[in-house]
């Protein structure tokens, strides 16, 4: 009896387009749908009411799911647009000479170059005074543990060498930069020259990492060596730039020797002459079919240039002058 009375009340409310508060609902177009809904409820009895309750509880949530997803995607799209355009910073499309897209973010096409492989590799600065001898003996002493640890694993040796070789240019460039700011003086281009050297050595390392996958203990060794060498060279450069540059010059001479031995093993077949990494081909403008031997050849030439620059810088200091008084070899990789 009560169910019949309730059905009649609901039917009249739906047909008249009113809600539970007595307010009239939106449109009369809903009335046929409401009438059909009411007939189903009455015909189904208790089951009909359960079906109606379940539908009202489930349908709105299901309808909201795609809307939430759309709102989320829209917010994400708006956020990405804001992040890339709000500050007005956007990278222009960079292409190679053949029109293909440039794949690297770490350097641009105008920073690539062809290394001068005809440079004299046999040059050696003969120690002339006590400080020169100290620098020379220090480098020879540092070579002993390197030979014992790496032996003829020249790929791993080169990786370790480049983590050290990239430090002096950064330290020297940084200290000259601070000196220029402190004394209101030009650097003579030496800040740029030394930072270019550091960047060039870093690219050597990025290339070697593509060829040699360092083990966990080698990574740990790199961490320790870099921490010790950076701080030691920082203090040395403050105390005596002439000795610091002379040590780097002798380090580069050792690097030339190591890469020469590397090439001997490549030529003898002891080390496989694998294809050159893509980053090396683009950085040194090598042929597309370049091999590892070509990469080691250009890296060795770079080390010879760094040898000349640092011995030259040390000679300037030994003559009692400052670096800014002599023209810096900018772009001299």
From Swiss-Prot:
Cofactor note: Binds 2 iron ions per subunit.
E.C. no: 1.10.3.11
GO molecular function: alternative oxidase activity; metal ion binding; superoxide-generating NADPH oxidase activity; ubiquinol:oxygen oxidoreductase activity
Residues annotated to bind Fe cation 2: 201, 252, 303, 306
Membrane topology: Multi-pass membrane protein
Residues annotated as binding Fe cation 1: 162, 201, 204, 303
Listed InterPro entries: AOX, AOX_sf
GO cellular component: mitochondrial inner membrane; mitochondrion
UniProt keywords, alphabetically: Disulfide bond, Electron transport, Iron, Membrane, Metal-binding, Mitochondrion, Mitochondrion inner membrane, Oxidoreductase, Respiratory chain, Transit peptide, Transmembrane, Transmembrane helix, Transport
GO annotation, biological process: alternative respiration
UniProt KW Cell division keyword: no
Cofactors demanded by this protein: Fe cation
Record has Transcription as a keyword: no
Transmembrane segments: 158-178, 220-240
One Pfam family linked to the record: AOX
Localisation: Mitochondrion inner membrane
Principal subcellular localisation of the protein: mitochondrion
Reactions that this protein is recorded to catalyse: 2 a ubiquinol + O2 = 2 a ubiquinone + 2 H2O
Self-association state and partner proteins as the record states: Homodimer; disulfide-linked.
PANTHER family tied to this protein: ALTERNATIVE OXIDASE (PTHR31803), UBIQUINOL OXIDASE 2, MITOCHONDRIAL (PTHR31803:SF6)
Similarity comment text for this entry: Belongs to the alternative oxidase family.
Function text: Catalyzes the cyanide-resistant oxidation of ubiquinol and the reduction of molecular oxygen to water, but does not translocate protons and consequently is not linked to oxidative phosphorylation. May increase respiration when the cytochrome respiratory pathway is restricted, or in response to low temperatures.
Record protein name field: Ubiquinol oxidase 2, mitochondrial
Gene assigned in the entry: AOX2
């Amino acid at each position: 009896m009560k169910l019949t009375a309730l059905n009649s009340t609901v039917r009249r409310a739906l047909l008249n387009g009113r809600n539970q508060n007595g307010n009239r609902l939106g449109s009369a177009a809903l009335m046929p749908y409401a009438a059909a809904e009411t007939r189903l409820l009455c015909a189904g009895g208790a089951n009909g009411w359960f079906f109606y309750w379940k539908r009202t509880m489930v349908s709105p949530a299901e309808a909201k799911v795609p809307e939430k997803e759309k709102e989320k995607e829209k917010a994400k799209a708006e956020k990405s647009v804001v992040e890339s355009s709000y500050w007005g910073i956007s990278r222009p499309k960079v292409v190679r000479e053949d029109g293909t897209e440039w794949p690297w973010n770490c350097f641009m096409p105008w920073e690539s170059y062809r290394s001068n492989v005809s440079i004299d590799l046999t040059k050696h600065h003969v120690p002339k005074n006590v400080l020169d001898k100290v620098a020379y003996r220090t480098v020879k002493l540092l070579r002993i543990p390197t030979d014992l640890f790496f032996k003829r694993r020249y790929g791993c040796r080169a990786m370790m060498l480049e983590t050290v070789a990239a430090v002096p240019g950064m330290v020297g460039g940084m200290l000259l930069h601070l000196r220029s700011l402190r004394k209101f003086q030009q650097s003579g281009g030496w800040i740029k020259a030394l930072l270019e050297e550091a960047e060039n050595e870093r690219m050597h390392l990025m290339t070697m990492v593509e060829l040699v996958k360092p083990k966990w203990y080698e990574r740990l060794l790199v961490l320790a060596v870099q921490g010790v060498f950076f701080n030691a060279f920082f203090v040395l450069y403050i105390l005596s730039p002439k000795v610091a540059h002379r040590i780097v010059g002798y380090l580069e001479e050792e690097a030339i020797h190591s890469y020469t031995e590397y090439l001997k093993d490549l030529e003898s077949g002891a080390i496989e002459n694998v294809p050159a990494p893509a980053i090396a081909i683009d950085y040194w403008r090598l042929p597309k079919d370049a091999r590892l031997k070509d990469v080691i050849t250009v890296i060795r030439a770079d080390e010879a240039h760094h040898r000349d620059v640092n011995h030259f810088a040390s000679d300037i200091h030994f003559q009692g002058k400052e670096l800014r008084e002599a023209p810096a070899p900018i772009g001299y990789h």
